[in-house]
Amino acid sequence: MLGWFGIFGRSQEIQRLERALRAHGHHPALVMDAVKITTVKQLKAAAGGQTPDQNAIESAATLLAYCAMGREDFAENNGWSATAAVEDRIVAAFERGGTIDEKLVLLALTARMVHPSVRERFDLKAE
């Protein structure tokens, strides 16, 4: 995932995720490598073991950026319609259960990277 002992650099999937995070206004250095690696592994599992496509990477980055930045900062960088869309995704993820969105939000929560306003808004707790 991170290249062979770092000699060859980061994997293309990780690089794509980092670019997508940056495009949403969240610096990728603020996301732990373990979260990025696990995100890519979750996306691969959801794609039946195949390399995740760009849409899946973008979708995951949107969710992670929102969780980390909080509603206001995310909206400032991405607009209110994108903010409403990601909030709808979070609600739907926990209503359905077992979705990739739910897994990614729980990953962010476990990694302690969820903004306090997001934790409060969706009543998210890590136990």
Residue ranges and their predicted role:
Residues M1-F5:
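Hydrophobic membrane-targeting and insertion signals
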Residues G6-D53:
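Short terminal alpha-helical segments
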Residues G6-G9, A75, D123:
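Compositionally biased, low-structure terminal segments
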Residues Q12-E13, F74, D88:
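Amphipathic alpha-helical interaction segments
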Residues E18, A34-K44, N55-A65, A82-V86, ...:
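Amphipathic alpha-helical segments in structured regions that serve as interaction surfaces
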Residues H26-D33, A46-N55, R71-W80, F94-L104:
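Charged, low-complexity interaction regions
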Residues G79-E127:
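Amphipathic alpha-helical binding modules
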